[in-house]
Amino acid sequence: MLFHVRMDVRLPSDMDPSVRADIVAREKAYSQQLQREGKWPHLWRIVGEYSNISIFDVGSNDELHELLSGLPLFPYMDIRVMPLATHPSKVVE
């Protein structure tokens, strides 16, 4: 199942710099693990924002929820999810 996910990060301005560095490092490691596993095949930065657009390829809604809630930055994110379906006009490759 494919999902289009927008993640907007809102870290507190008064967050301790060492805490911020740690959480960002853990986020990078976890997201790269999911990318290597093929569950997070596309990741793009939104220009000028601390946000991204991603495509997840997972087996179920529950699996996606588990992966997203496991992100170290999850408590600081606004996340919007759109399930995707194959378009009938897509060129077959």
Q: What do these predicted ranges mean?
A:
Residues M1-E93:
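Conserved, structured core segments of small domains
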